[in-house]
Amino acid sequence: MVARIFKIIVIAMIALIVFVIWAGMSLFRGIDLGGTGHSTSPGIIDEYKARKIKMEKMEQLQANLEFVCKHEEKPELLPETQQLYNYALYHDLHNMWTGKRGDAVWNGLARYYRIAAMNGDYKANIRLQYLLKSGRISSDMPQTEVHNLNEELAKQLPATAYYNLYGYLDVGYGVRTEKDGKYAYLRKAADLGSREAQYVVADILGDINDEETLQMRLEIIEKLRTCASEQGLGKASNSLGIGFIIDKEYAKALEAFHQGVKNGDSQSALQLANGFNEKTRPDDKLNFINLQPDLERSYRYKIIEDYLYEKDYLQPKVPDLDDIVPLPPAPLPEWDGKIAFQRWFEGEAPPKPDEALVRRLAWQAGLNGDTG
């Protein structure tokens, strides 16, 4: 009996020892204690490799997205070509609401735009491309003429020309490229200083759904929008201002919206009209900018907002804003209720350019003096 009990105890102890050894091996199997007799768990290796690859991708992404703000340098415009441009623009804009595509007004103005553009006037070039592409000015080969104009524009404003090319590739307007090849032109345009390209790149970065790169992308987006805003793009200013409101950086929001009004953005004007309104409370997350209520400032911004909104098709700007509603604490000057663009638009038409000048410029550019 005793021998039997002893045998059971011995078997139990052996079983316990085997269990302890097995448990110990399981516990330490994934631990590298040094030397050559141990191996690292495949799971740990895979996790390390994945982390390393992700870090490398982040570094590469950051390098690819690195952005240094560049403003597009605009060459000086000749007074002679500006005579043609200003005359054409005045009548062109007055035809925008009631005119029909290919009508006598726009086709008659094409001559002045063409001659000015081919004499290096980038404003005439940009406007003429728009009028041709939209069909307002008739042409036997509009796509060919537009692309020839854009090649000429590249001599004065390469960034804008690259952005135009991106736009034409995007809609297949007479040019083709490999799939997604258009984005190379967009990035090039942004780097060279196109404000429109900078804004579009910012929007593309904002649409990426990736939490890990979010902070990095937000910083680049702000740089891009700031750069575009500084160069006169109103919607970039407004986007900046909204972002600053979300972050409760109200002083920055005020400056961004004020710049947006100068750049012709009606939404920025509305933000400031509401921001200075005494009815706007801190719980109004869309309009509160932490401003001292000022009914006259609010009223002036609202007048400007109404005009910019109603005349959006004319693309008016307000470079004279500081003479109308300077930022506080500057006092408000006298104001007749009109912005400078409005006075120009409602005023008399510029004088018709001298015919001898028109023909001389046409000859100078190798163009037909009658049609451009």
Over which residues does each language-model region extend?
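TPR/TPR-like (Sel1-like) alpha-helical repeat modules
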Residues: 254-266, 273-282, 287-311
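N-terminal leader/linker segments that initiate helical-solenoid repeat arrays
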Residues: 22-108, 119
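Short helix-capping/linker turns of helical repeat alpha-solenoids
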Residues: 77-80, 84, 94, 119-122, ...
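Short coil/turn linking the two alpha-helices of tandem helical-hairpin repeats
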Residues: 88-101, 129-140, 166-176, 202-214, ...
